[in-house]
Design a protein with these regions (language model features):
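Rossmann-like NAD(P) dinucleotide-binding subdomain of oxidoreductase/dehydrogenase enzymes
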Residues: 105-241, 292
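Structural signal for hydrophobic packing residues in well-ordered secondary-structure cores
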Residues: 28, 32, 47-50, 54, ...
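Electropositive phosphate-/nucleotide-binding environments in soluble metabolic enzymes
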Residues: 14, 18, 33, 40, ...
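Amphipathic, non-transmembrane alpha-helical secondary structure
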Residues: 18, 44, 86, 136, ...
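ALDH superfamily catalytic-core signature
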Residues: 205-305
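N-terminal Rossmann-like NAD(P)+-binding subdomain of aldehyde/semialdehyde dehydrogenases
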Residues: 2-113
Length: 305
């Protein structure tokens, strides 16, 4: 997601975005408490969306990155997405059950329970680094809980964003789930909609702006933000094993992962052996260097710099 712009005036809100939101909000008002068979059906359709179109998904993500091996997309996005859906299908009906909770003796013989209820329309802002998984994961949570969901895809993955929009339109009615695409202007307008919950994955700087925009509507926000991820190597830990494991995490997706190791903390006397082993491990993993098709490309020049 790019830097966000000035808040929009009500009349400046993109018509299709506003219409998509209003459609879902009206649908939820008419049917606020969906039953498990309906939720299960939506999850099953989401699973088919991924499994039936896996090869095309891998090709479009490869095109957006300018080179990302299919096996990496499978391991990091396709399989985790299917696992999320299958987990919700296994447990979703149980999650809907009321939960009895303790009541103080001063309130006896009263009884109390927690009753799970849908929120309404859930907004999801998806980043570019794992565009499939970071769209599917939040959608699973929204749909299994009985919500409607509106998803804003990243402008940095235009081919996949267009494909995902087309697939969601194929497998879902617009009042169930919908996708919007566009630049920072659309992202700003999206954040200003009065969602019942908003989920954002991206940078800390943009996360602040998303939360500020949502605050005008008192929209609850879940932020999953980037940061620095240190790795610590204990004095007694084998250097070669440490280098192998750290490089595996760092080089996955060319390091374009929010939890990819950023730096290593280790005893001074282990620095040179670690650097030597890390270089050797990188050569073993990618012997052709940048010419190796198994190494993911950086998504664009801006992020490379």
């Amino acid at each position: 997601m790019t830097d966000m712009v000035e808040p929009m005036k009500p009349n400046d809100m993109p018509t299709d975005l506003q219409s998509a939101f209003e459609l879902q909000r009206a649908a939820f008002a008419q049917q606020p408490h969906s039953q498990w068979p309906e939720r299960r059906d939506r999850l099953q359709r989401l699973r088919r969306l991924v499994s039936d179109n896996e090869e095309e998904i891998e090709r479009t993500i490869d095109a957006d990155f300018g080179g990302r091996p299919a096996i990496e997309t499978q391991i990091a996005e396709v399989y985790p997405s299917l696992a999320e859906i299958n987990g919700a299908l296994r447990s979703g009906e149980r999650w809907m059950r009321p939960e009895r909770v303790w009541v103080s003796k001063w309130f006896l013989p009263a009884r109390a329970e927690i009753q799970p209820r849908p929120l309404g329309v859930v907004g999801v802002i998806v980043p570019w680094n794992y565009p499939l998984y970071l769209a599917i994961g939040p959608m699973v949570g929204a749909l299994v809980a009985g919500n409607r969901t509106l998803v804003k895809m990243s402008e940095y993955t235009p081919a996949f964003s267009a494909l995902f929009k087309r697939l969601v339109e194929k497998y879902f009615a617009p009042e169930e789930a919908a996708v919007v695409t566009g630049d920072a202007t659309v992202a700003q307008a999206f954040s200003e909609l009065p969602f019942d919950h908003l989920l954002f994955t991206g940078s800390t700087a943009v996360g602040r702006r998303v939360m500020a925009a949502a605050a005008a509507n008192l929209t609850p926000v879940t932020l999953e933000l980037g940061g620095k991820s240190p790795t610590v190597v204990a004095p007694e830990y084998p250097v070669q094993r440490a280098a192998t494991r750290i490089l595996a995490g760092k080089l996955l997706n060319a390091g374009q992962t929010c939890v990819a190791p950023d730096y290593v903390l280790l005893p001074r006397e282990m620095i040179k052996p670690f650097v030597r082993e890390a270089r050797a491990q990188a050569r073993r993993m990618f012997p052709a260097g940048l010419g190796n098709r198994d190494f993911c490309a950086v998504v664009n020049q801006r992020h490379y710099q």
